[in-house]
Amino acid sequence: MKTKTAFMAILFSLITVLSACGAGSQTTGAGQKKVQTITVGTGTQFPNICFIDEKGDLTGYDVELIKELDKRLPHYKFTFKTMEFSNLLVSLGQHKVDIVAHQMEKSKEREKKFLFNKVAYNHFPLKITVLQNNDTIRGIEDLKGKRVITSATSNGALVLKKWNEDNGRPFEIAYEGQGANETANQLKSGRADATISTPFAVDFQNKTSTIKEKTVGNVLSNAKVYFMFNKNEQTLSDDIDKALQEIIDDGTLKRLSLKWLGDDYSKEQY
């Protein structure tokens, strides 16, 4: 009887040890954090940055950078949630997403509500953009009496609004919600005279559309762009900064920029 009791005690101890080992398998290792799922809010209408390719896959510079961060941060699992650009910050504020990855520029209004990481991952040169056969608009100074179309709440919209207000509002600003294709169609139809874009977005547009565009004039903004978080995500932001700096230092960010944007926009050059 004593032998049976001793056997049962040993068996119970063994089961307890195995159960503890099983519970530990939910972490990435002894003393390490459990894997945390991070939902990344992004769009599908930004050429080269976040878009759906011919295979139906979400890809682009911002998307592939997040995938690279996913490889280097094993205690996080990054997943994507796509939506219209105008819904990104609303979703972030409602904690429906944890990060916004969509070439986001800092502004006082945004910094009041949200957190930006510290390490910039792109430099975003914005220029006035018109149809290739338009020789009358050579820069923003030529937009008097014109209609300029852009995405609401975008970096370009902020630049246009500020310039317009500082210069007596010489042109009308209109907003679209369907991305680059709608903008191009409005330019072609004459409903809009110009837009604001980047050289790499225009290059992609010209390769994939029959509506050809060009950038004109001086660079209006060469802002650095960052990821956006809620104010309580400082640890996540810091972890991303550490991995992002490694991606910059080993040349991976430059390679991503050359592949998706056609030049090295990982550093300021305009």
From Swiss-Prot:
GO cellular component: plasma membrane
Domain of life of the native organism: Bacteria
Topology term for the membrane: Lipid-anchor
Lipid attachment in record (S-diacylglycerol cysteine): C21
One GO biological process term: amino acid transport
Lipidation sites (N-palmitoyl cysteine): C21
Induction record: More strongly expressed in the presence of methionine than in the presence of sulfate.
SMART domains: PBPb
Keyword terms of this UniProt record: Amino-acid transport, Cell membrane, Lipoprotein, Membrane, Palmitate, Signal, Transport
Subcellular location: Cell membrane
Signal peptide location: 1-20
Keyword Signal: yes
Annotated InterPro entries: Solute-binding_3/MltF_N (IPR001638)
Family per similarity comment: Belongs to the bacterial solute-binding protein 3 family.
Quaternary organization: The complex is composed of two ATP-binding proteins (TcyN), two transmembrane proteins (TcyL and TcyM) and two solute-binding proteins (TcyJ and TcyK).
Summary of the function given for this chain in its UniProt record: Part of the ABC transporter complex TcyJKLMN involved in L-cystine import. Is also involved in cystathionine, djenkolate, and S-methylcysteine transport.
Protein name per Swiss-Prot or TrEMBL: L-cystine-binding protein TcyK
Upper classification of the organism: Bacteria, Bacillati, Bacillota, Bacilli, Bacillales
